[in-house]
From Swiss-Prot:
Family: Belongs to the TIM16/PAM16 family.
UniProt note: phenotype after gene disruption: No visible phenotype and normal sensitivity to pathogens, but higher expression of pathogenesis related genes PR-1 and PR-2 in Atpam16l. The double mutant Atpam16-1 Atpam16l is lethal.
Membrane topology summary: Peripheral membrane protein
Descriptive protein name: Mitochondrial import inner membrane translocase subunit PAM16 like 1
Entry's localization field: Mitochondrion inner membrane
PANTHER family for this protein: MITOCHONDRIA ASSOCIATED GRANULOCYTE MACROPHAGE CSF SIGNALING MOLECULE, MITOCHONDRIAL IMPORT INNER MEMBRANE TRANSLOCASE SUBUNIT PAM16 LIKE 1
Length: 113
């Protein structure tokens, strides 16, 4: 009998705690959206996804005076080496570096043309 009462107290208590936690979480989300914390957090995350041109050059091991063909050659070499070893993280870094330099070269060719 005592075990049955103890079990029912534990079940009821855990239900109350679960409801309180979900309600507190909802309230925290509402407060965060009012103050703009959620927007600031997403902006911080978005800023972290892009790399700078200097970092992209460093990843690929090229200089500012390197031709586009040289950049593509370095990209292909590094991408294939990391594909063989199975390093998806390094492959994505190399790919992001190429994308960054590609946009930089496109901007420089459109302004010089």
């Amino acid at each position: 009998m005592a075990a049955r009462v103890l079990a029912s107290v534990i079940v009821m208590g855990s239900g109350i705690i679960a409801r309180a936690c979900t309600q507190a979480y909802r309230q925290a989300l509402a407060n965060a959206s009012k103050t703009g914390v959620a927007h600031e957090a997403t902006q911080t995350i978005k800023r972290g996804l892009t790399i700078g041109e200097a970092e992209a050059r460093q990843i690929l091991g090229v200089t500012e005076k390197s031709s586009w063909d040289e950049i593509l050659k370095k990209y292909d070499t590094l991408f294939e080496r990391n594909a063989q070893n199975g390093s998806f993280y390094l492959q994505s870094k190399v790919h992001r570096a190429k994308e960054c330099l590609e946009t930089a070269y496109q901007k420089s060719t459109t302004t010089s043309a």
